[in-house]
Amino acid sequence: MSFNAFASSLSKKLQEISTSVSEKTQELPSLAQSTQRMVQERLGQVTDISQLPREYTELEDKVDTIKLIYNHFLGVTAIYENGSYDYPKYINESVNEFSRSVASKLTELTHATSASEAQNILVAPGPIKEPKTLNYALSKVALNSSECLNKMFPTEEQPLASALLQFSDVQAKIAQARIQQDTLIQTKFNKNLRERLSFEIGKADKCRKDVHSMRLRYDVARTNLANNKKPEKEASLRVQMETLEDQFAQVTEDATVCLQEVISHANFSEDLKELAKAQAEYFETSAGLMKEFLSNSFAEEPEAKPEVAEEEKPQTAISMNDEDDA
């Protein structure tokens, strides 16, 4: 690149920066006036406030309600993203497991004979961890209890040990069903609500800010024109007010369309249906597994009818005959 071309390019860049700075500088008085106006309105010092169309304010209220519902539900259903929500004890167990893992690696490192071997020990993955859920904890404790009974009485059949083993298997299956429920809720409920909050409602919030910002600027321009005491400025102030009035009307129209789109896409009944379906499938699976376990492991035997002693039968007959004679 020649020096002249470089100089020309540099001059152009400097001109663009100068223009940008000039524009920002010109905006400062307007921004200061808008900020002052906003404070005055909040303090009740200004009552001449341009009213937004009723259709628009009703749309704002509807979108606020949708946003409130989404946020309130997510405040609860976000718990499904924490696998141990039904087993808080796992925190202590995780600390103990981490300590054991560190101790094990330190022991292995003391026996390493080379730097590469030590590196392999450090990067080697740890044991596969079971999900820290209540059902998995029940499955584990039932399995351990079954093994203890079998070791204590190796030559005897242990119905309780067998029942514990079956209970362990059932709890593991229920744990898997719960994890499946959590995954469905995360992907088909939480994710959908968050995406709408981030994109559609986020876009609507920006449009609403533009409307209220433009309304402030328009009201400032109206006030400036009304309070003007210099005839030579009246024409320019009127043009400024009319320009801002048109811009205010345009951003309000654009925001109205945006708010309507949010409302039309907010099919929360379908989201609620997905949440209920995930829960129903989990509850049905869990109930079915538990009923099957109870039926197989604790089948109730029919109660035996009490036998009537032979010597009591004639006595009963005699008693009845005595009543007839009476």
From Swiss-Prot:
Keywords: Acetylation, Golgi apparatus, Isopeptide bond, Membrane, Phosphoprotein, Ubl conjugation. Pfam families: BAR_2. The modification Phosphoserine is found at residues 2, 319. The modification N-acetylserine is found at residue 2. Residues 302-314 have a biased composition (Basic and acidic residues). There is a cross-link at residues 13, 305, 313 (Glycyl lysine isopeptide (Lys-Gly) (interchain with G-Cter in ubiquitin)). SUPFAM superfamilies: BAR/IMD domain-like (SSF103657). GO terms for cellular component: cytoplasm; cytosol; Golgi membrane. It is found in: Golgi apparatus membrane. It is a peripheral membrane protein. One of its GO terms (biological process) is establishment or maintenance of actin cytoskeleton polarity. Present with 7721 molecules/cell in log phase SD medium. This is Protein GVP36. It comes from Saccharomyces cerevisiae (strain ATCC 204508 / S288c) (Baker's yeast). The lineage of its organism: Eukaryota, Fungi, Dikarya, Ascomycota, Saccharomycotina.
